[in-house]
From Swiss-Prot:
Ranges in a coiled coil: none
Naturally occurring in which organism (per UniProt): Arabidopsis thaliana (Mouse-ear cress)
Homology family: Belongs to the RLP family.
Membrane topology reported for the UniProt record: Single-pass type I membrane protein
Regions that span the bilayer: 170-190
Residues the record marks as carrying a glycan: 119
Extracellular face residues: 20-169
Protein name per UniProt: Receptor-like protein 5
Keyword tags: Cell membrane, Glycoprotein, Leucine-rich repeat, Membrane, Receptor, Repeat, Signal, Transmembrane, Transmembrane helix
InterPro entries: Auxin_Ser/Thr_Kinase (IPR052422), Leu-rich_rpt (IPR001611), LRR_dom_sf (IPR032675)
Entry keyword annotation includes Transcription: no
Gene3D superfamilies the record matches: Ribonuclease Inhibitor (3.80.10.10)
Cell compartment(s), UniProt: Cell membrane
């Protein structure tokens, strides 16, 4: 037999519980999406500093937030004695322009995720205890004064992005070094080639002088032979006509030129 009393009791309990949970469920559903983004950021710090002051559903009314037309454009947590690390969830606030976390006790690295913020201009993390590399992004000024261990290795939050870029940089430097070595070797080889070619060039004028001397000597021989032939020819001609003149035969030396043709044989 069905116990109706038990069923009625269960239904009454469910109604009471539902009526009590409804406001809480509604509050959770009505939470501003920005609140859901900001809370994980604060969770990396000491939350006790924010529990008493951060109330309500409008983050623009909370201390440390700067808004423009209902949009958070700045986070300023200066001298709050915050401990912990800087949350990468800052990158979820896409409208951020300024992040000021100076004069605290924050440790470890500056997350590289903040470099994705297109509107970000200033990040002030001076006077903290940060370690690791500082992101280098054009258009973003990162102030790191009085962080004695900045740029050193932090084992808690490694940076896989930078580690992947290191082999590329090494390959680039190696390629430049090899190119310089090859260029230097080629220049040195060309220099040696020029040195070896110079003695040969210096000997060329001597050879030219030798050839000139040989040519001049050959010409002198030809001229002497012509002179001998010319004398013989004159002698023979005068001998043919010796009956005209009773005096001794006279020979004259004639230079061989184009204007003095040989006398015909008679």
């Amino acid at each position: 037999m069905i116990n109706y009393r038990h069923i009625v009791f269960c239904l009454c309990v469910m109604v009471v519980v539902d009526s009590r949970l409804t406001p809480y469920l509604a509050a959770i559903e009505q939470v501003d999406p920005i609140v859901k983004i900001v809370l994980p950021i604060v969770g990396r710090f000491d939350p006790e500093e924010f529990v008493t002051s951060w109330q309500g559903n409008n983050p623009c009314e909370w201390f440390g937030t700067n808004c423009l037309e209902g949009i958070i454009i700045g986070i300023s947590f200066i001298s709050l004695n915050l401990i912990g690390t800087i949350s990468p969830h800052f990158a979820d606030l896409t409208s951020l322009r300024v992040i000021d976390l100076s004069h605290n006790r924050l440790k470890c690295t500056i997350p590289f995720e903040i470099t994705k913020l297109k509107n970000l201009t200033i990040v002030d993390v001076s006077y903290n205890q940060l370690h690791g590399e500082v992101p280098r992004v054009r258009g973003i000024v990162i102030l790191t004064e009085r962080n004695p261990n900045i740029e050193s290795t932090c084992l808690l939050v490694p940076s896989p992005t930078r580690n992947k870029n290191k082999p590329t940089v090494l390959v680039l430097l190696l390629g430049i070094l090899v190119g310089l070595v090859v260029a230097g070797g080629a220049s040195f080889g060309f220099y040696l080639y020029r040195i070896r070619k110079q003695p040969k060039r210096l000997q060329e004028p001597n050879e030219a002088v030798t050839l000139t001397q040989q040519q001049s000597s050959d010409e002198s021989l030809v001229s002497d032979e012509s002179y001998v032939i010319s004398l013989q020819l004159q002698y023979r001609v005068l001998r043919r006509f010796s009956w005209v003149s009773k005096g001794p035969l006279l020979l004259t030396r004639q230079l061989k030129t184009n204007q003095n043709p040989h006398l015909p044989y008679m």
